[in-house]
Structure formats: structure tokens, C-alpha cells
């Protein structure tokens, strides 16, 4: 069976979906904190995007690759999509670049 979800570092609080099966309600199993856990996607998640594997509280760091990639702007529950609607990047907003807005 091919792996559809990756957690890149044990400190991460997100997983990366590498499957076209990112529909709301899809279930994935992976080892988190040494235990096999099942996650149900709370919404459709595109290939290559992230979802939470632990609760992430507003203001908490979002961790991928073992490093902070941003700060949660809202509470994020396990299985929820983690993207620009609920995280402020540590590196700026590439989607705003070139629009006369602060990146």
C-alpha cells in the first residue's frame, strides 16, 4: 500500500497529503506520538496541502519539517486544512506579493 500522508518530523503538528483522495470524510492512518491514529478530513484538502494532526490553538506555532512555518490565526482541530485561511506565514504572504499589499 502506498503512503498517502507524510509527517516529516516527530515535532510536526501537521501532515502533508500526497494523495488525490483528499475529500471531506476521507480517513488516513499514521503514527503520531508513537501511536497509530486515524484522522478524518474535515473538508476537502488538495494534493500537497497540510492538515492538523494535533490541536493547534490560536497563536500557537504551526510546525512542519520540525520548524515553525507560521502562527495559527484560529484554532485548528485535527483533520482540518491548514492553509492561508488559518495560518500567518513566518515568511510573508506570497499570494499578496505584487498586489501593492504588504507581503
Please describe what each predicted stretch is:
Residues 2-103:
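N-terminal small-residue-enriched
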Amino acid at each position: 500500500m502506498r503512503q498517502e500522508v507524510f509527517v516529516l518530523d516527530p515535532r510536526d503538528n501537521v501532515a502533508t497529503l500526497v494523495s488525490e483522495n483528499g475529500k471531506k470524510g476521507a480517513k488516513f492512518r499514521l503514527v503520531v506520538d508513537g501511536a497509530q491514529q486515524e484522522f478524518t478530513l474535515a473538508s476537502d484538502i488538495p494534493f500537497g496541502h497540510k492538515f492538523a494532526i494535533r490541536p493547534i490553538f490560536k497563536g500557537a506555532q504551526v510546525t512542519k519539517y520540525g520548524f515553525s512555518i507560521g502562527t495559527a490565526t484560529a484554532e485548528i482541530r485535527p483533520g482540518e486544512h491548514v492553509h492561508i485561511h488559518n495560518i500567518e506565514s513566518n515568511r510573508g504572504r506570497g499570494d499578496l506579493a505584487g498586489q501593492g499589499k504588504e507581503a
